[in-house]
């Protein structure tokens, strides 16, 4: 058997997401994929422990939520046994019952349901789309979000939700790009301005809504792109928002790369030739140092390290980029994650804002190469 065939088989074992990642060309990830698969499974086992405690709302300024949607998305992408175990249904039911009230919640729920079964959960995804469209700020960003009037969704009639395969549970064909999409009309807006963290997740969620068959207003993409272009710093990077006097840092810049590419894709513009994207590539290549994510408002200390690792994955996957400068992001990140997984299957940063459940979810999303690349059509 050829080396390419063996590599393709190994990637297939991680699931459809990993296999899609290596389309052109089939790049050697440079890590032991059997060890990666085992680490993913151990991480999934960890986040399924003690769910009664994990799913309780926590008091965090601006959030007021729990981690159910992030756990759900990580389990969907982990695939295999992760989506057939009873804990998966517990997390799914919990996430579906909660009223949409926050940007992160709506965005990640849309991502999870679109990856799991967009036909069965179309009504829920449509509500996520409406919530996100109605919460876009005047300047094109998103803030934490607030409740909007939404109908009570239900499962699609005549369809059954059954577990899918690894790396995304793709149990129905994605024909959203070849059939008429259901338009989402903007009915309101958020505050005057938001931040680049909520904004990058809102755009990821809206991308999933589009892929599930819902047409996001053209102006939503236009304003979203304008917000990123107008807040890019001279060094090519981004920080959290205009209010904080701090320099660019990796996680916001990686989020910016993916966000600009998403917006330009739906605006039918060539993101590959974008000066905004290429300047950001330069910043990441110059400052690539996994897992360090020095944040100015935290005194330059590395913070939100696993949030940062998942942002690397999205920047690389969305733009079909295997390296930033000389840095092969998947090899470097996967090796670091394999070295730093704890005995109980979890990951947790020792730096500020470490959290075992969140950090483990972000690690799983990185290792599974969870993000579907944007297919550039030459427009």
Question: For the regions a protein language model found, what residue spans apply to each?
Answer:
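An alpha-helical repeat/solenoid feature that recognizes helix-turn-helix modules
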Residues: 22-42, 53-87, 98-130, 137-222, ...
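Sec/Tat signal peptide C-region and signal peptidase I cleavage site
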Residues: 17-21
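Positively charged n-region of N-terminal signal peptides that target proteins for export
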Residues: 1-4
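Bacterial N-terminal signal peptides
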Residues: 8-16
